[in-house]
Structures are given as C-alpha cells and as structure tokens.
Amino acid sequence: MAIKKRSATVVHGASGAAAAVKNPQASKSSFWGELPQHVMSGISRMVPTLIMGGVILAFSQLIAYSWLKIPADIGIMDALNSGKFSGFDLSLLKFAWLSQSFGGVLFGFAIPMFAAFVANSIGGKLAFPAGFIGGLMSTQPTQLLNFDPSTMQWATSSPVPSTFIGALIISIVAGYLVKWMNQKIQLPDFLLAFKTTFLLPILSAIFVMLAMYYVITPFGGWINGGIRTVLTAAGEKGALMYAMGIAAATAIDLGGPINKAAGFVAFSFTTDHVLPVTARSIAIVIPPIGLGLATIIDRRLTGKRLFNAQLYPQGKTAMFLAFMGISEGAIPFALESPITAIPSYMVGAIVGSTAAVWLGAVQWFPESAIWAWPLVTNLGVYMAGIALGAIITALMVVFLRLMMFRKGKLLIESL
C-alpha cells in the first residue's frame, strides 16, 4: 500500500491538544507544484483576448492593404487624409481604422488579463484587481520622475515596459500577498465588508505601485531592453537566431505554456516593430502539417503502416486544423510516441521557419495560418518554408518510427 507524504506533522502538547506543524519542504514542493496551474489559468483566460484582438487587427490590415491596395509604407490614417478614397471605399477605410484601433486596445489587454487571472487563481477574487493593475503597469508603466541638475527642475521619462516578465512576477507576488493578508488580518464580522472592499484592495494597490515602480519595471525593462539591443545590433544574424529560438519555443509543447510565453515575446517585439512574427506563425502550422503528412507517405516510402490505426484520421484532422492556425492537432502523435514526434517537428519547425526568414518572408500581423497569409510579404517564400518544415518533419518521423519498429521498440496496431 502506498503511503503519501503528509504536509504537516501532528504534535501532542502537554494539554493533549493536537497542533499542526507545517513541513517547510512540503510547502515548498506544494508552491512549485501549484505554480504551473496558476500560470496556465492566466494563459487560458488570456487566449480569447489575444485571438479577438489579433483577428480584428488582421482584418483591418486585410481591408486596407489587400482590398484597397494601400502601399505598405502608408498608414491607414494617412490614407484617409490623402483624399484618394470616396464612397464605399472610404467607408471601408473608416471601418479598417476602427478595427485597427479597437483590435489594438483588445490586444493591449491580453497581458493585464493574464496577470489578473494568475493572481485570482492564487489569492482568490480579492487578488484579481491587484493582478490586473500590475499587468496593466507592465505594459503601460508609470512615468519615471528624474531631477535634472543642469536645469534644476524635475522631469519625467518613459521607462521600458517589463511586459510579460513583469506581469508574471507581479501577478504571482500580488496573488500570494493578498492571500497572506486575507488570512492574517482578522477583523470582527461587522468589519468584513471594510476589509474586502477597502483595506485589502488599497494595501495591495499600494504594494503593486511601489513594487512595479522601484523593482519590477526596472528589472523587466532592463531585460527587455537588453534583448532588443542585442538582436538589433546583431542585424541579420540576430534575426535568424531569434527566429530559431522563437520557432523552437513555439513548437515544443504545441500550444502549452512555453508556446504562450514565446507568443508574448514575439508579439511584444512585433507590436513595437522590432522584429516580425514570421518565425512563430510558421512554427505553429509545421508540426500538425508534417505529422499529418507522415500518415499519408509512410506506406508509400516503407511499404508498411507505421502508425496506430486511430492516428491516421487524426493526421488528416491535424492538417486541417493547421490551416486554421491550431497546432494542438499534433498532440495525439506527441503523446503516443514523444521520442519520434517531438524531435521531428522541432527540427522541421526550426529549419522551415529560419529558412523562410532568411529568404525574406515577413509577417508583421499577429495571427497565423490563413488569417494572415494574404498580408505576408514574399508569400511564396513563406509557403516554401512551411512546406520544407513539414516535409522534414514527415520524413524524420517516418524514419524514426521505422527504426524503432525494426528494433522491436514500437508496437503498431493494424487497421
């Protein structure tokens, strides 16, 4: 019979009463065990905001730059003021401007939503406002107050936003702080409303303000600024290294937390017009297309079926979902045989994404698959990168499965 470790030891005092003594090691393990769940809670609530903002933003660009043929170096507002549009085209352009503005606002709420729900998952609904405020300050930090000795005057300056790094740190800290304060601050029943609607919100807001201003924004901004400086200074080599890293992080867990973190990094660079989102968008679709393709070519290449019966229809489904920008269709393959699937689609995603970036494919619009393809610069090269990555993925997984089958390490259920 398995005996589970207890998180507390019962000690009997002189009076015979039992007292629970916390085990620090168990509490530490519990913290690290629960933390990924809290982070995923924030990510799952943030994704709809990202999708809404991204799709509406992409739609505005589709109207302006594909349908109305506005030159890529001209903004929508400049096009409105050019006097070249009238009637229905002018109405379309106005709608494109509205979609761009609204989509940008929605997109800007993604990180605050993430931070709010991470804090909420940790500290309950009382921690939600603190998390939201912290997430908002990570994208729109408070101005820095500086004294200029030359003019003997105070002036303000804009710090580098801490973005995802800052939101992650402040949401966790604020969540546990509110949870601790709620447990430790004991008031009479008639003051509970005062505690939950005034005292805890004010204390947590002051903490977030001070922590973000003096610690988290400088730290996160320093990291973000350093990364951008290095990538910009490295030029083409930096862009290729960035593409490889983003592609690997995007593909590795097929929509999981690492993928979402890579999305935050990529989108922050894209919205600030530092680096395009090309590599991430390509890496999203390569794994499901490649694994789906493997179920089609395995018998033609090897003379035998190398996948279990249920994976063949799932391969076709994965390919279809890939064109919708959904990589989760590849998950059954990764679960069934991670040793063959994960290395294959990782290599395919890295090679295909990097090749497309190196050959000049550019995508600035924060969406993937068919939703953004009409807005890609050098679409032919972009699609060639997807094809290259998918073919590499398919060939690798077929070859690895064949090797394992011949060694007797792969059991295949026949159709």
UniProtKB/Swiss-Prot annotation:
Residues 35-415 form the PTS EIIC type-2 domain. Residues 1-46, 123-126, 179-197, 259-276, 340-341, 400-415 are cytoplasmic. It is a multi-pass membrane protein. It comes from the Bacteria. Keywords: Cell inner membrane, Cell membrane, Membrane, Phosphoprotein, Phosphotransferase system, Sugar transport, Transferase, Transmembrane, Transmembrane helix, Transport. Residues 68-101, 148-157, 219-237, 298-318, 363-378 are periplasmic. Its main location: membrane. The chain crosses the membrane at residues 47-67, 102-122, 127-147, 158-178, 198-218, 238-258, 277-297, 319-339, 342-362, 379-399. Pfam families: PTS_EIIC. This is Fructose-like permease IIC component. It comes from Escherichia coli O6:H1 (strain CFT073 / ATCC 700928 / UPEC). The lineage of its organism: Bacteria, Pseudomonadati, Pseudomonadota, Gammaproteobacteria, Enterobacterales.
